[in-house]
C-alpha cells in the first residue's frame, strides 16, 4: 500500500502541458483551450498569428522548456506540425529528452504502447509519401523529356523575378522551421557561453556534444533567431580580445559551463580528444591542470567557485 501511495504522489505524476495554435483565418482558440483543460492540462500555451507565418515563438520556447516526464498535449496534429515528417522530427527530439506527446483527436500518445504503434504507422506513411513524391517527380521529368520539354519551373528557367523570389522565400521558411525545431538542442549552450566566449570555442564545445557546426553557420543561425525575436541580441555582441595564453583557461571554463556535471577527469578527456596541448607540456591532460585553469577562471569571475 505504501508503494502505491508513493507511485501516485503528485511529484511523480506527469505534467500535462497544452499547446493551442490559432490563425486569423481559423478563430477557434477557445474551443482548443476548453478541450485541453478538459484533458487535464494545468498549463496551456497559446500561439496567435497568420496561417501563412512559419515563425512560432511560443512553441519554440515551450519545446525548450519542457522537462523529462512532461507530456505535450495538442487538440489535433496539425496544431503542432505542418507535415508528417516535421511532426516526427519534433516527437523524436522530445522522446530523446524523456518528454511524451499526446494528440486528443488522433490516436497518438507516446507514453502508451498503442500510441507508439500509431506513431510508427505515421512514420511508415511519411516514408511512403516521400517515395511516391520522388516517383511522381521522376515520371514527370521522363514524360517532359519524351515530349521535348525541359523539366522544372518555367519561371526559374526564364529567370522571372517573381519565381525567384517565391523559391527564395520558401527556402527561408524551411530554414527557419528547421532552426526552430533544432534550437532547443544547442541554443541553451550558446546562451550560457556567448558573448564571453569566442564563436570558435562555442563551436568546438557544441561539436564535442554531437553537433556539426561551423562558425559561419552557427553565427548565421543565431542571427536569424535574433531577427525573428527568438533569441537575445546580446548573443551577437563582439567578444573581447584576449591574449593567446588566455585561450586554454577560457576553453576549459566554456566546457565546464556548458556541462556543469563534468568531473575534472571528464574535462581532461575532452581536451585530449580536441587535441589541445596541455599548458606545461606532456602528452595527456591531468585533472590538476584542469583544476588550475578553473581556479584562474574563478578568480576573474568567469565561473563560480
Curated annotation (Swiss-Prot):
This is Probable DNA-invertase y4cG. Residues 15-148 form the Resolvase/invertase-type recombinase catalytic domain. InterPro entries: Recombinase_CS (IPR006118), Resolv_N (IPR006119), Resolvase-like_N_sf (IPR036162), SSR_resolvase (IPR050639). Keywords: DNA integration, DNA invertase, DNA recombination, DNA-binding, Plasmid. One of its GO terms (biological process) is DNA integration. One of its GO terms (molecular function) is DNA binding. The active site is at 23 (o-(5'-phospho-dna)-serine intermediate). The keyword Lipoprotein does not apply. It comes from Sinorhizobium fredii (strain NBRC 101917 / NGR234). Signal peptide: none annotated. It comes from the Bacteria. Belongs to the site-specific recombinase resolvase family.
Amino acid at each position: 500500500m505504501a508503494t502505491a501511495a508513493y507511485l501516485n504522489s503528485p511529484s511523480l505524476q506527469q505534467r500535462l502541458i497544452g499547446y493551442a495554435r490559432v490563425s486569423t483565418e481559423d478563430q477557434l482558440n477557445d474551443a482548443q483551450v476548453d478541450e485541453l483543460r478538459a484533458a487535464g492540462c494545468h498549463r496551456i500555451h497559446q500561439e496567435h498569428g497568420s496561417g501563412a507565418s512559419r515563425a512560432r515563438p511560443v512553441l519554440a520556447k515551450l519545446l525548450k522548456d519542457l522537462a523529462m516526464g512532461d507530456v505535450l498535449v495538442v487538440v489535433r496534429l496539425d496544431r503542432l506540425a505542418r507535415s508528417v515528417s516535421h511532426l516526427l522530427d519534433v516527437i523524436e527530439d522530445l522522446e530523446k529528452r524523456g518528454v511524451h506527446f499526446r494528440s486528443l483527436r488522433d490516436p497518438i500518445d507516446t507514453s502508451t504502447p498503442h500510441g507508439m504503434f500509431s506513431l510508427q504507422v505515421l512514420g511508415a506513411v511519411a516514408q511512403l509519401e516521400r517515395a511516391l513524391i520522388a516517383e511522381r517527380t521522376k515520371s514527370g521529368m521522363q514524360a517532359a523529356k519524351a515530349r521535348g520539354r525541359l523539366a522544372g519551373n518555367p519561371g526559374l528557367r526564364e529567370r522571372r523575378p517573381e519565381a525567384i523570389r517565391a523559391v527564395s522565400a520558401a527556402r527561408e521558411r524551411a530554414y527557419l522551421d528547421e532552426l526552430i525545431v533544432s534550437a532547443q538542442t544547442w541554443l541553451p549552450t550558446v546562451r550560457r557561453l556567448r558573448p564571453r566566449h569566442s564563436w570558435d570555442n562555442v563551436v568546438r564545445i557544441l561539436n564535442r556534444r554531437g553537433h556539426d557546426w561551423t562558425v559561419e553557420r552557427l553565427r548565421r543561425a543565431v542571427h536569424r533567431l535574433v531577427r525573428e525575436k527568438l533569441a537575445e541580441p546580446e548573443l551577437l555582441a563582439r567578444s573581447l580580445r584576449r591574449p593567446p595564453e588566455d585561450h586554454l583557461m577560457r576553453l576549459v571554463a566554456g566546457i565546464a559551463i556548458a556541462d556543469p556535471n563534468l568531473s575534472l577527469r571528464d574535462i581532461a578527456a575532452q581536451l585530449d580528444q580536441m587535441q589541445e596541448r596541455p599548458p606545461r607540456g606532456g602528452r595527456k591532460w591531468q585533472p590538476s591542470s584542469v583544476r588550475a585553469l578553473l581556479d584562474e577562471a574563478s578568480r576573474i569571475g568567469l565561473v563560480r567557485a
